[in-house]
């Protein structure tokens, strides 16, 4: 502390920094959730509306943004038809997010690569399916990614995204 005599304003600066670090902004306090959407989900509203409904992915994203705001969550919404891109986003999310919501689409039933990426994430993961995969074709009954998920939501259509946000919020609140 003898050095403080040389820099008389240093103590005030250190005290101010410590106090300001203790007061984080509301945005900084928000948990960040990455919502990943796999192949063909960019075609929602057009593809099999009798199964998936008439909402587009943009409609769902808008609803999710509003719902996340009511929960105090910050979300980023992404979609890719490319398996490797989803894997990269999951790997990057380890450092930048607090939870994942994953609607892997058809990759659910085929991708060991997604399972491996999700297995190293080590934070809450909600697996999401708009349709009830167990009421559909036999090949859809198997999910490779379920083994890495904290929980699974399926069969609630576009409302499943809000349910997934609620689940993530509860998991994050538990710590």
PLM-predicted stretches and their roles:
Residues 29-33:
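Extreme N-terminal starter segment of soluble prokaryotic enzymes
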Residues 39-41, 105-108, 131-133:
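Short glycine-rich anion-binding loops that position phosphate/pyrophosphate groups of nucleotides
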Residues 74-84:
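Short beta->alpha junction loops
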Residues 93-100:
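Short acidic/histidine-rich motifs immediately flanking catalytic phosphotransfer sites
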Residues 119-136:
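Short, acidic/small-residue loops that bind anionic groups at enzyme active sites
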Residues 135-175:
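Short, glycine-/small-residue-rich phosphate/pyrophosphate-handling segment
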């Amino acid at each position: 502390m003898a050095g403080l005599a040389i820099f008389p304003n240093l103590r005030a600066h250190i005290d101010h920094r410590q106090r300001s670090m203790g007061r984080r902004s509301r945005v900084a306090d928000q948990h960040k959730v990455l919502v990943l959407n796999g192949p063909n989900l960019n075609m929602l509203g057009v593809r099999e509306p009798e199964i998936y409904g008439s909402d587009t992915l943009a409609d769902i994203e808008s609803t999710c943004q509003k719902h996340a705001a009511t929960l105090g969550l910050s979300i980023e919404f992404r979609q890719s038809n490319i398996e490797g891109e989803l894997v990269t986003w999951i790997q990057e999310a380890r450092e930048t997010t607090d939870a994942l919501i994953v609607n892997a689409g058809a990759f659910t039933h085929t991708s060991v690569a997604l399972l491996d990426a999700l297995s190293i994430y080590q934070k809450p993961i909600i697996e999401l399916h708009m349709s009830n995969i167990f009421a559909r074709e036999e090949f859809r009954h198997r999910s490779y990614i379920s083994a890495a998920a904290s929980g699974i939501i399926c069969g609630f259509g576009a409302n499943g995204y809000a349910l997934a946000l609620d689940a993530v919020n509860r998991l994050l609140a538990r710590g």
